[in-house]
Amino acid sequence: MASKPEKRVASSVFITLAPLRRDVAMAEEVRQAVCEARRGRPWEAPAPMKTPEAGLEGRPSPWTPPGRAAATVPAAPMQLSNGGCPPPPPVLDGEDALPDLDLFPPPPPPPPVLLPSEEEAPAPMGASLIADLEQLHLSPPLPPPPPQAPAERPSVQPSPLRPMEEELPPPPAERVEKGASTDICAFCHKTVSPRELAVEAMKRQYHAQCFTCRTCRRQLAGQSFYQKDGRPLCEPCYQDTLERCGKCGEVVRDHIIRALGQAFHPSCFTCVTCARCIGDESFALGSQNEVYCLDDFYRKFAPVCSICENPIIPRDGKDAFKIECMGRSFHENCYRCEDCRILLSVEPTDQGCYPLNNRLFCKPCHVKRSAAGCC
């Protein structure tokens, strides 16, 4: 088959042969090889096939004028070896449709193309192409693979649910190794083995033999103990560390009162005059560090005003000030001029006290008394 379409002239009708169609795409080299093989041999017309119209061959064909070729219309369109059909010839309306062409003699009529009978099977598509490939010692193209049915996915069936005990794996058994422990003895700073006796006290771990009194080394495991400064002590050693009362000399175990740099029982810290427990009240001391309540101390040691002859003590939560003049004591309100009763100042000013003959006078009164020469 030529690379370009081949044309044949039949009278004035041009028949164009279309190239063969291939169902399977070939490589460019195979196509060129087939074309060269076909150029070397003449065109092979398809073998005539029997048809029901074969009996009409003996009948004379209709008359045609000389110089013109009779156009033969085949009973069925010509089929190519690859199953294609050429395009139909143009239809002539009359004898004068085309001019007379006397250049070439009329070609012989084409052989009739008969339809294949039902008994004879049609030639397989591409038989001539396979024969050409066999001559060139080339392997024929592989037929297209048959369409495969979509693979069925295996049906996944949910497995029956099992109880929770079966799905969860059993917890791993805890292996306790010999001597493996994270507890450290707070006394010897060594590991506390699980097989050893241990004591937990003061938020710490101890070996049983290490938990002892820090003074006498007495075993305290299973015993009552006291804690002082983070150290365990037995009861006798703890009492030895306690303070003793400054009055009776006994150990102060419960409530303690600290005064004068000593410790006292609450019942021992009392007034020496009325024997009343002072507790957390204010107190006063005598010349020999005797403890007095305030009332007894003022009654015994408070100065007496030389004017009103009352003790000078604080009253109504207010402090009392003592004014001393000429060896005598006075209340602030009693420190006045004996003539004009004006309050005298404690400062050495004109408003101060100007005594005369052991009496209190202001400056003006003092001048008058001195000028008169009498008291």
UniProtKB/Swiss-Prot annotation:
Domain LIM zinc-binding residue range list: 183-244, 245-302, 303-372
Q: What is the protein's given name?
A: Filamin-binding LIM protein 1
Renumbered to this chain, the Low complexity biased-composition regions fall at 150-159
GO cellular-component term (any): cytoplasm
Domain of life of the organism encoding this protein: Eukaryota
Q: Where is the composition biased (Pro residues)?
A: 104-114, 140-149
Q: Which residues form a coiled coil?
A: none
